[in-house]
C-alpha cells in the first residue's frame, strides 16, 4: 500500500521512542546478567569434572546472553533509525505546512497542492500559483521519503 499525505499526518515518534527505551532497558539487564554470571563462574574455586562441566555450561550460557544482548542492541539501532526517519519526515511536513500557510496554498489529504489566493490581488495570486507548484514538488518528495522510511 502506498503512503499518502493523510497517512503521514498521523505519524508520531512516540511508539518508536517507547520501544527503543524498552530495548535499551532489556539490553542493560542482559549485559548485567551476563556480567553477573561471569563473575559467579569466575568465583568458583573448586576443581573436578562436575565443576568443569558447570563452568563449560555457564560459559555457553553467558555467550548466549551476550549474543541476545547484541541482537537487542541491533534491534534498538534499527528502531532508532526508523524513529529518526519518522522525525525527519514529520519536520519536513511541518515545514511544508508552514510554507503552505504563508503562501496561500492548501495541501489536500491525497498530497495534491492548490492555491487558495482567490480573493487576493493579481501579484499575490501569481506568487501563490508559483508557490503551489514548488510546494507540490516538496510534498511529492516528502511522500517519497516517507514511503522509503516505511519500507526500510
Regions found by a protein language model. Give the residues of each.
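N-terminal secretion-targeting helices of virulence/extracellular proteins
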Residues: 1-151
Amino acid at each position: 500500500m502506498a503512503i499518502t499525505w493523510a497517512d503521514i499526518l498521523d505519524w508520531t515518534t512516540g511508539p518508536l521512542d517507547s520501544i527503543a527505551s524498552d530495548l535499551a532497558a532489556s539490553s542493560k539487564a542482559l549485559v548485567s546478567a551476563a556480567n553477573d554470571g561471569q563473575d559467579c563462574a569466575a568465583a568458583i574455586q573448586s576443581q573436578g569434572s562436575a565443576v568443569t562441566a558447570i563452568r563449560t555450561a555457564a560459559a555457553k550460557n553467558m555467550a548466549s546472553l551476550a549474543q541476545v544482548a547484541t541482537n537487542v542492541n541491533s534491534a534498538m539501532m534499527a528502531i532508532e533509525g526508523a524513529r529518526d526517519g519518522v522525525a525527519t519526515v514529520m519536520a519536513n511536513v511541518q515545514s511544508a505546512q508552514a510554507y503552505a500557510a504563508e503562501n496561500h496554498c492548501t495541501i489536500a489529504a491525497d498530497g495534491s497542492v492548490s492555491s487558495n489566493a482567490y480573493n487576493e490581488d493579481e501579484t499575490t495570486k501569481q506568487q501563490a500559483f508559483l508557490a503551489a507548484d514548488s510546494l507540490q514538488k516538496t510534498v511529492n518528495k516528502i511522500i517519497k521519503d516517507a514511503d522509503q522510511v516505511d519500507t526500510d
